[in-house]
């Protein structure tokens, strides 16, 4: 019997990746900025961070501020967002020492969320996303061949390795966590939320 077979992937979940060219030219300034915030607010806030330091939220709206200016430039180059769409961005800085991690969470009351890695050494803790398909069973996923799973990104979880100067933007409803920092250095990142609105 001849069969014509095809797979149609519906309801994809886009993860947008930006790599900043020449990031090393501004990296030290951003690192100093992060530690400066921690010095001003040593206690930080506790949300999903286990052992790590997290700053209070702040809006990205000050062109004269080094981090704000950098983030505005990055997000203004978002190639798939319509020009007529306004983005309101709030952010916070994370400093995870060796042994620190972030538990599973999502970001409510916004449209997109993201992370920018400022300092990320080897084994500093991958970001892990969980499949949003709530009723997907382990048996179903593990019954498929490796080629099928790889070509369709069909997994329960998906990892990204932190890379300095890389930004990921993802749907805010997507559950995710940050694995333990197993390096000997601090892992520094900026997390942010984006609220979208149409001018027209």
Which residues does each PLM region occupy?
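Histidine-centered metal-chelating micro-motifs
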Residues: 100-101, 173-177
